[in-house]
């Protein structure tokens, strides 16, 4: 299951991010350690130096916004997040089909993140570039994603996915990984659907309604059963 989280960044924040990112140095990303050995063979893009003050500052701003985003919390149940990184595709840049590494070592630390979910936060508007669609293979179809700047998609890190060649303009994005308190993707999906039912029932019937309270209790009991902290 994938989820689109809208307006992680406002349009003003996107413009501010892009004003700084467009002036930055963008080295070839093939040697970057976040890609496994097989993924590097199909990787053809650019990536901002993850240790640069700009990458750290913008990444921290994204994390602060996500910390205030109820939909992200309800869907992901985040336990740990890999610090956001930034990439750019231009002049035919692409990334062939691959799945993300299961375990990711955070640079200059002893922290290891299990990649349960991958996130792409779009920083270019769809009309700024041709191509560059994110394709994600699910059990039943190939999902094609090209979102408005400031919007983000979450998808299972184990799913095969690729970025199609960018033939005009530049596709700029932030990407990172989430380790969830709820490891199983099916359990996360059920919890999210139940959470949405609780929210809708609360609006329709009021928080004091016995049915709403029972639904909320079921949600929290399932979360208690499935979550690791």
Label every PLM stretch briefly.
Residues 1-85, 190-229:
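Non-heme Fe(II)/2-oxoglutarate
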């Amino acid at each position: 299951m994938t989820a689109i989280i809208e307006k992680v960044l406002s349009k003003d924040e996107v413009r501010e991010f892009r004003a700084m990112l467009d002036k930055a140095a963008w080295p070839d990303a093939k040697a970057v350690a976040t890609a496994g050995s097989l993924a590097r063979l199909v990787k053809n893009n650019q990536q901002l130096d993850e240790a640069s003050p700009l990458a750290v500052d913008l990444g921290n701003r994204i994390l602060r916004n996500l910390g205030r985003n109820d939909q992200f919390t309800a869907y992901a149940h985040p336990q740990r997040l890999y610090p956001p990184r930034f990439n750019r595709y231009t002049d035919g840049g692409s990334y062939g089909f691959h799945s993300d590494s299961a375990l990711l070592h955070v640079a200059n630390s002893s922290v290891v993140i299990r990649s349960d979910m991958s996130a792409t936060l779009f920083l270019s508007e769809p009309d700024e570039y041709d191509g560059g669609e994110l394709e994600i293979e699910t059990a039943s179809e190939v999902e094609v994603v090209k979102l408005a700047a400031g919007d983000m998609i979450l998808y299972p890190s184990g799913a095969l996915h690729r970025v199609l060649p960018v033939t005009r303009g530049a596709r700029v994005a932030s990407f990172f990984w989430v380790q969830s308190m709820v490891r199983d993707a099916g359990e996360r999906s059920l919890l999210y659907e139940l959470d949405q039912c609780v929210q809708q029932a609360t609006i329709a019937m009021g928080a004091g309604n016995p049915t709403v309270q029972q639904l909320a209790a079921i949600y929290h009991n399932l979360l208690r059963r499935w979550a690791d902290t």
